[in-house]
Design a protein with these regions (language model features):
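Extended substrate/RNA-proximal surfaces in nucleic-acid metabolism proteins
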Residues: 1-71
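Charged catalytic cores and adjacent phosphate/nucleic-acid-binding surfaces used
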Residues: 47-149
Length: 149
């Protein structure tokens, strides 16, 4: 595994570097959307030590959200794994927090096959409504607009 090869088997170090790199990307600017905010958990959860509730995971993720809010960016809600595992990125548990922080979101499937482009889309909209979102962002005629859910 690459965790063993590149991070000496230390999942916590991998998580730290992932979020450090995400923060650097946000700071560098030139973007509207932060995607794959916590997609690291897709593979990270294969390790027994991996725990979303632990400070070593939660705090750097929340620091990224703080920076997203500060910079006025939006977060991608990625539905790629909804059909297989009923998972979104960021995790469903974080949607309410993003709503509380008034961080706008856009829904994307990140699919590589045209017939899967809408997989999980309706479910993501439903979960966003449950989390208190009233709209998502969509690119309309070259401009980001809030579209009611």
């Amino acid at each position: 595994h690459s965790v063993e090869r590149h991070f000496e088997g230390d999942v916590r170090l991998l998580v730290k570097r992932f979020f450090d790199t995400t923060m650097k990307m946000i700071e560098a600017g030139g973007i509207d959307i932060v995607g794959h905010m916590d997609k690291i958990y897709m593979n990270g959860q294969k390790y027994d030590i991996f725990n979303f509730e632990e400070d070593w995971y939660r705090k750097p993720f929340e620091a990224c959200l703080d920076l997203v809010q500060e910079k006025g960016l939006m977060v991608e809600v990625n539905t790629k794994n909804w059909t297989k595992k009923k998972e979104l990125y960021p995790r469903v548990e974080y949607l309410s927090r993003m709503r509380e922080m008034n961080i706008p979101v856009m829904v994307n499937s990140d699919c590589h096959y045209p017939d899967l482009v809408n997989d999980g889309r309706k479910e993501a909209f439903k979960l966003l409504k449950q989390a208190g979102f009233k709209s998502t962002r969509e690119l309309v005629k070259g401009k980001w607009q809030d579209i009611a859910l």
